[in-house]
């Protein structure tokens, strides 16, 4: 087994919940998802986010197969779910637990405060290490940029395997090739 195969095997075991014992006293994912739903309802009421037109609901059928309901349509996810997960876990779509769609606020770099952080794709190393921290003024940035806030998850939309992913330690603006999103809960 090569080092890469070992790494992939460990990662697969981790996402399947097989590296540590599953404690039956741990809060099930369904409780967290209820809190996230309540938080989203509050944000909708405060008009900070919009209600989804056709939200996705993933559930296990009587045959123990995962299904997804969107609007009135129900379809099997048997071909999309790559492995079984512990009973206390749940499959969800990223949009159900994050503010991906609401984080696309744009600003023109020339009108941005020159002292704020200006992040470019080459500033993030594969694996998530920050290589360089420059302000908008130091970069002499131009064009439209995407606004992000401290704690947002930033990832490269040009790297579908998400090797360039980073949690923002500060507020700032970034190149449109970097997509920020915020996880609820």
Locate each region found by the language model.
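Generic recognition of stable, solvent-exposed alpha-helical segments in well-folded globular domains
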Residues: 1, 5-6, 31, 76, ...
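Proline-centric
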Residues: 2-4, 13-16, 83-92, 178-185
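Generic, well-ordered alpha-helical scaffold segments in large soluble proteins
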Residues: 5, 9, 13, 35, ...
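Short, well-ordered loop/turn elements at secondary-structure boundaries
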Residues: 5-7, 15, 112-113, 148-150, ...
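Extended, domain-scale alpha-helical bundle/helix-rich regions
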Residues: 6-74, 78-80
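Non-catalytic DNA-recognition/assembly elements of restriction-modification systems
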Residues: 9, 18-20, 76-105
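DNA target-recognition patches
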Residues: 66-75, 95, 107-140
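A short beta-sheet element
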Residues: 143-146, 150-185
